[in-house]
Amino acid sequence: MAKQIRKTNKKVKMTKLPKGVVHIQSTFNNTIVTITNLKGEVISWSSAGAVGFKGARKSTPFAAKTAAQTAARQSMDQGLKQAKVLVKGAGPGRETAIRGLIDSGLQITLIRDITAIPHNGCRPPKKRRV
């Protein structure tokens, strides 16, 4: 008879921190939302793929909003009330992810775009011919 494997639950640190930083990375294929404290330690995270969207649906604005709401709910359970928002990337889920944070009840104090802009660095991909 096979031995049963015991599953251990992840321990979630319950800290009451009122302020944090929301990092939104929006690419053309996915949107990743990470919420950290002011030191940079991760409190919660979510992405369009982790919420349940697959394939081309991950790149939709609705998937980005759902991912942002999921991450915000997890962090608000740990006591987060105010947050700064740092947005990186040029994907379709930039603005809707911020709206998802506002809809979930998180108070936003700052929105900053930290997208890296090349000074004529890498060559861009060729244009699609359909």
UniProtKB/Swiss-Prot annotation:
Compartment list: Plastid, Chloroplast
Molecular function terms from GO: rRNA binding; structural constituent of ribosome
InterPro entries: Ribosomal_uS11, Ribosomal_uS11_bac-type, Ribosomal_uS11_sf
SUPFAM superfamilies in the record: Translational machinery components
GO CC list: chloroplast; ribonucleoprotein complex; ribosome
Cited NCBIfam families: PRK05309.1, uS11_bact
Protein family according to the UniProt entry: Belongs to the universal ribosomal protein uS11 family.
Protein's gene: rps11
Record's keyword terms, sorted: Chloroplast, Plastid, Ribonucleoprotein, Ribosomal protein, RNA-binding, rRNA-binding
UniProt main location, coarse: plastid
GO biological process, one term: translation
NADP recorded as keyword: no
Name of this protein: Small ribosomal subunit protein uS11c
Subunit and interaction comment: Part of the 30S ribosomal subunit.
The keyword Cytoplasm belongs to this UniProt entry's keyword annotation: no
Pfam families cross-referenced by the UniProt entry: Ribosomal_S11
